[in-house]
Amino acid sequence: MNKILIIDDDRELCALIKRSVQSEHIEADFCNTGKEGLQKLKEQEYQLVVLDVMMPGMDGFETLEEIRKENSLPILMFTSKNDSISKVRGLRAGADDYLTKPFDMDELIARIASLIRRYTRFNQQIGAVQKLDFDGLQIDLENRSVTTSNGTFELPPKEFDLLLYLSLIHI
């Protein structure tokens, strides 16, 4: 069963989202601070994070930055700010999707399901392959590194996943 982590300081909203995704056979944990969320991500495996921007202490952007240092799972951000600057900042920092509060719960659930579907399908495709070889380029899936004639490189998680995705389309 797929499992998501909801990080938001609004406990009632977390409980509502948890109940809503459970009706779609998706398990959910929630926590109310960015630090708690980072700890849960170290302890358990999730297929998606739902992350609020406006939280006391470590805000959603800082939390997103920390998550992206270690993890490439999909992240859906939301906020009550309805300005394009926040949306663009979140997407550029590594969020996969962005919703503005108030949002329609059915739309949120559909976006969550869509992101999980793409993530799990992508991981199933690469699960059987250890290395991809192209003319002058080798992608090592086990070590998450890229080798060219100029040497071996470790890319940030999002960039590695994008390169891998584009390579799989090429095959």
For each feature predicted by the language model, list its residue ranges.
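Short hydrophobic/Thr-rich beta-strand motif most characteristic of the beta2 strand and flanking loop
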Residues: 25-32, 40
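Charged docking surfaces used in two-component/phosphorelay signaling
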Residues: 15-23
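Receiver (REC) domain active-site loop signature in two-component systems and cognate sites
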Residues: 55
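Basic, amphipathic DNA-recognition helix from helix-turn-helix-like DNA-binding domains
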Residues: 65, 69, 74-133
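Conserved sequence signature across two-component system core domains
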Residues: 7-8, 31, 49, 99
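Active-site beta3 strand of CheY-like receiver
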Residues: 44-50
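Short, Lys/Arg-enriched segments at the junction into DNA-binding effector domains
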Residues: 3, 114-160, 164-168
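Acidic catalytic/metal-coordinating carboxylates
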Residues: 32-36, 59-62, 86
